[in-house]
């Protein structure tokens, strides 16, 4: 039974009438452009065929009832006429409540909803299960009540909910790609203007995500340190963000900067340039150049931004040794563990899976998780 069938069946069973709509919003993987988003730079993610699915129907009152199929059918119920506050014990409820609360501040022309939620985006793997949930909930209200909100506004609403209601400081990329993803395409996103450009993916190429299953510990504190170092760099150049600094300007005065800050700045500037070039390499179907850019990105994250760990580097090396110049591989996400992403010709996927299975656990003592994905459509009815 797929997620649509599962949520529709549970909806009818619990609520006693059929759902009128089923909505999906996908998770995502970032192909290149790491730690560039909060520097007003460029990112190149694609939506993946793992998603949050919600079967739903409008109510004729002001109550919102929610069932979380993946949490033993836990229930949340709240009124649109009372202040929406955080739930004491159910963290998943806060994503739903936060989205609804922030929607009310944007456009209050909606009533109650019944919904059943289920998803298969792996949690804690850096594939944006939370953004997928936020965008799915926003799309439910937009579709059921014909709200005049576009995908970018639904994405911004989700980001606001996560920043202000849930209390997690995230950029806009995850929600934007979940809302605006396009089948068989990646999306070049300008994180300053929120402008997007669809980039077609070469035919016969698989998007492979491998979770190192190395438990991330430093990610919060180190992430904040990196942001501060980038802001220090921007101040040195008297610019609002590193987006506004050229590599030439940096190279001319790099020796005057604190050496650690200089390394951080060099990563962001070079990564921005790589990301824009990667979009054009992908569009031309030049997988060899894309592979070189991904390798440079990984080396920059490892040596200049210093956010990889030995387990991640090992995983990247195993994949690279298997695919040679026929594809690309790099760490993806915030760093200090998490996942790697690889673009691999479909006929090489079994060889990569076998090499990783034989070598990674033997070298690190940890068993990986392997996902083969397709670039998928953003949020909407399913």
Curated annotation (Swiss-Prot):
Protein biosynthesis listed as a keyword: no
Residues where Mg(2+) binds: 130, 162
Pathway(s) annotated for this protein in UniProt: Carbohydrate metabolism; galactose metabolism
Pfam families reported for this sequence: GalKase_gal_bdg (PF10509), GHMP_kinases_C (PF08544), GHMP_kinases_N (PF00288)
Residue positions binding ATP: 124-130
Record keywords: ATP-binding, Carbohydrate metabolism, Cytoplasm, Galactose metabolism, Kinase, Magnesium, Metal-binding, Nucleotide-binding, Transferase
Residues at the catalytic site: 174
InterPro entries: Galactokinase, Galactokinase_bac, Galactokinase_CS, GalKase_N, GHMP_kinase_C_dom, GHMP_kinase_C_sf, GHMP_kinase_N_dom, GHMP_knse_ATP-bd_CS
Gene Ontology CC terms: cytosol
Catalytic activities: alpha-D-galactose + ATP = alpha-D-galactose 1-phosphate + ADP + H(+)
Localisation per UniProt entry: Cytoplasm
Keyword Magnesium annotated: yes
Annotated EC: 2.7.1.6
Residues the UniProt record annotates as site (Transition state stabilizer): 28
Family, similarity comment: Belongs to the GHMP kinase family. GalK subfamily.
HAMAP family assigned to the protein according to its UniProt record, in alphabetical order: Galactokinase (MF_00246)
Record-given protein name: Galactokinase
Source lineage: Bacteria, Pseudomonadati, Pseudomonadota, Gammaproteobacteria, Enterobacterales
């Amino acid at each position: 039974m797929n997620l649509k069938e599962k949520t529709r069946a549970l909806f009818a069973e619990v609520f006693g009438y059929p759902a009128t709509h089923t909505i999906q919003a996908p998770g995502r993987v970032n192909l290149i452009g790491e730690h560039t988003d909060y520097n007003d730079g460029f990112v190149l993610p694609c939506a993946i065929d793992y998603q949050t699915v919600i079967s739903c129907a409008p109510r004729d009152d002001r109550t919102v009832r929610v069932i979380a199929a993946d949490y033993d059918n836990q229930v949340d119920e709240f009124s649109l006429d009372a202040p929406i506050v955080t739930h004491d014990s159910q963290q998943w409820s806060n994503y739903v409540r936060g989205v609804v609360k922030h929607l009310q501040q944007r456009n209050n022309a909606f009533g109650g909803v019944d919904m059943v939620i289920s998803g298969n985006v792996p949690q804690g793997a850096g594939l944006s299960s939370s953004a997928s949930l936020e965008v799915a909930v926003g799309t439910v209200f937009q579709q059921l009540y014909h709200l005049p909100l576009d995908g970018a506004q639904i994405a911004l609403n989700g980001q606001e909910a996560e920043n202000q209601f849930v209390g997690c400081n995230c950029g806009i990329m995850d929600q934007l790609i979940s809302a605006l993803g396009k089948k068989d395409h990646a999306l070049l996103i300008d994180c300053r203007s929120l402008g997007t450009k669809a980039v077609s993916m070469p035919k016969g190429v698989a998007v492979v995500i491998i979770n190192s299953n190395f438990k991330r510990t430093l990610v919060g504190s180190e992430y904040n340190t990196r942001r501060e170092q980038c802001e220090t760099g921007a101040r040195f150049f008297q610019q609002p963000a590193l987006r506004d600094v050229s590599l030439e300007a940096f190279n001319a005065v790099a020796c005057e900067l604190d050496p650690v800050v200089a390394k951080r700045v060099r990563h962001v500037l070079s990564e921005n340039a790589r990301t824009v070039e990667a979009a054009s390499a992908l569009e031309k179907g030049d997988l060899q150049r894309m592979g070189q850019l991904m390798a440079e990105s990984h080396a920059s994250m490892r040596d200049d931004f210093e956010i990889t760990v030995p387990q991640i580097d090992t995983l990247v090396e195993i994949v690279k040794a298997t695919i040679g110049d026929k594809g690309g591989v790099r760490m993806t996400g915030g760093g200090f563990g998490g996942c790697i992403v690889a673009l691999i010709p479909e006929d090489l996927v079994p060889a990569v899976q076998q090499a990783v299975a034989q070598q990674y656990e033997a070298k690190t003592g940890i068993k990986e998780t392997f996902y083969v994905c397709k670039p998928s459509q953003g949020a909407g009815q399913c």
